[in-house]
Structures are given as C-alpha cells and as structure tokens.
Regions:
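Long, hydrophobic N-terminal alpha-helical segment
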Residues: 1, 9, 15-16, 20-48
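Amphipathic alpha-helical coiled-coil segments and their boundaries
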Residues: 2-5, 96, 100, 142, ...
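Metal-centered catalytic cores of metalloenzymes
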Residues: 4-5, 11-14, 123-126
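Short amphipathic alpha-helical segments with heptad-repeat character
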Residues: 6, 10, 43, 47, ...
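Structural signal for well-ordered, non-membrane alpha-helices
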Residues: 13-21, 50-54, 58, 111-122, ...
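Acidic interhelical loop/turn segments
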Residues: 21-33, 90-98, 112-145
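Short, contiguous alpha-helical
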Residues: 32-78, 127-171
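Alpha-helix-centered segments that form part of catalytic cores
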Residues: 81-105, 109
Length: 171
C-alpha cells in the first residue's frame, strides 16, 4: 500500500473520531428524522463496510484470473453527496443504541484488521491486476477497494456534520 493511501486512511479516521468523541450517547444515537440514520448508525455502517471490503479484497486475491479493469474516478461518485447511494443490506447498521467509546473501539478494531490483512499481501502490485464488483461502483481494481474505504468515510463525515447541524449539536 502506498504512503498516500496509508496517510489518507489515517487522516480520515482521525477526522471521523474528532467528529464523534465529544458527543453524548443521546446525541450519538438520536435520529434527526425517522428515515435517517443516527450518527452511531453511520459509524456502525463504516465498520461494516471496512469489514466487507476486507472480505471482497481477499476474495478477489483468491481468483486465479488477472481481471484488470480500468481505474475509475471513484472520488467523483463517493464525494458527491447529491448522489444518494443505497447501502446493501449486508452493511446496514444495527438499530440498537451504541455508546461512543464502544463504537470507537469497533472502528479501531476494523482498521487494525484492515491494516493487518493488507500487511499479509506480499506483492502489492497484484492489487492493480485483479478486480471485484463493488455494489455501488461496479467492477473495481482491488487497490481502489482500499481507496474507497477512506473516500466513503469522508462522504459519511460530511453526513455526520449535517446530522449534527440538524440536531443542533455544537461540538
């Protein structure tokens, strides 16, 4: 994994944790609307997406074929919040309430699993040569599966900021 991707994973996760650390559990779990997720649910969704991404990359690596596909401008899709993307059921968050420290632990655990998994890949070049279909982005090279983790997280940090405004949360 190149240094820029690693830095982006680190910086984005730090920004996410800064957004949620000072929230009370009530603020964390309050939904601004019945049809919207709470901040806790957004964070749980991010954990589930990171874990699902590990599985997708692992599955792609097991395939014998070099299924190289064109690189996509995934940032255009993921960072454009005017384009709504319906989450697949497998990454739908729990409705049960969470405590802020509990979810920070889950976020840390999923990131540790991701980094540990990536460290087992001896030849990182293979990540550009194989691909797996992403539910929202289509056929995606495995290295872009890693990029989509932090881009997707950046998208949801903006959503968290919007939810905080709707809930009139000051921190």
């Amino acid at each position: 994994m190149n240094e820029l991707v690693n830095d982006n994973l680190y910086e984005t996760r730090n920004n996410l944790v800064k957004e949620i650390t000072l929230l009370s559990d009530t603020e964390f779990n309050r939904k601004p609307d019945m049809d919207m997720w709470s901040i806790a649910q957004v964070c749980h969704h991010l954990v589930l997406v990171e874990e699902a991404s590990i599985k997708a990359i692992a599955w792609g690596l097991k395939g014998n074929d070099r299924t190289s596909t064109e690189r996509k401008n995934i940032h255009l899709t993921l960072l454009d919040r005017t384009k709504k993307i319906k989450a697949p059921k497998i990454v739908d968050p729990d409705a049960a309430p969470f405590e802020v420290p509990q979810l920070i632990d889950l976020l840390n655990d999923s990131r540790e699993k991701l980094l540990a998994f990536l460290s087992t890949i001896e030849d990182k070049a293979i990540l550009k040569e194989k691909s797996v279909k992403h539910p929202a982005l289509g056929e995606l090279p495995l290295d872009q599966w890693i990029e989509q983790i932090y881009l997707h997280e950046q998208r949801h940090i903006e959503q968290i900021k919007e939810i905080k405004l709707l809930l009139d949360v000051k921190h």
